[in-house]
Structure formats: structure tokens, C-alpha cells
Design a protein with these regions (language model features):
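A cross-kingdom feature that marks ATP-driven nucleic-acid transaction machinery
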Residues: 1-119
Length: 119
């Protein structure tokens, strides 16, 4: 059971490769100014999928049991300062809709069974 999130990431990674994407892991630089000093950090994005001039940032989460976990997963996507597509894939919760930040929420099965799910 502990390995299930890793298996899910593996499935997503392989599906992205199958669809012709170059896939990498990304670190998004973030800056915190709350202390009066600028502190630099980074947030990890699970996948950066690139094909031709298309870039998609993808976060993967097995479950989103509460608002805190949702914020943890969405924060890196919200911090990306460009207009490329951003997607959160969960095992069951995603319904194929965009949220108020323009992030697409997909469930794993819709992602796998619909090759156009990222279009």
C-alpha cells in the first residue's frame, strides 16, 4: 500500500512517454519576503511534459483527503509564472474541470483512457 503513490507516478510517467512527451521533474524557484529578507526556496513539480512547443506541468496525488493536502499539491502549480497548462491527477477525485486558478483536475482513469485528456 505504501508503494501505491510511486506506482501511480510510474504509470503517469510511462503514459506521458507513450504519448510522445519528453518528461522531466521540475523545481520551481520561490521567494519568501515575509521576514523582511528575501529567502529563496523551491517547490517540486512531479512532471514537466514537453512536446514540440507544448509544456504541461503535472502534479500527482493518490488521494486528497483535506484542504491542507490540496494546498500542498496545488501550491507548486500556482507558483509557476507562465501560461502553460497545469494539471493535478488524482486516483479518483478529478472530474476533468478547471479550477479558479486554471488548473485542470483529472482522475487517473480518465487520464489513461482518454488520450486527449490533456488537450
Amino acid at each position: 500500500k505504501d508503494q501505491e503513490p510511486h506506482y501511480m507516478e510510474n504509470v503517469i510517467y510511462n503514459e506521458l512517454l507513450y504519448r510522445g512527451y519528453h518528461v522531466s521533474v521540475g523545481a520551481i524557484p520561490v521567494f519568501d519576503h515575509s521576514s523582511g529578507k528575501t529567502q529563496r526556496g523551491s517547490l517540486e513539480v512531479d512532471f514537466i511534459a514537453e512536446k514540440f512547443d507544448e509544456t504541461i506541468y503535472i502534479q500527482s496525488a493518490l488521494y486528497i483527503p483535506d484542504d491542507e493536502k490540496m494546498e500542498q499539491e496545488l501550491r507548486p502549480l500556482r507558483k509557476i509564472g507562465n501560461s502553460f497548462k497545469k494539471v493535478l491527477i488524482t486516483k479518483y477525485e478529478g472530474n476533468g474541470a478547471y479550477d479558479e486558478d486554471g488548473i485542470l483536475h483529472l482522475n487517473l482513469f480518465d487520464f489513461l483512457l482518454n488520450e486527449k485528456s490533456l488537450d
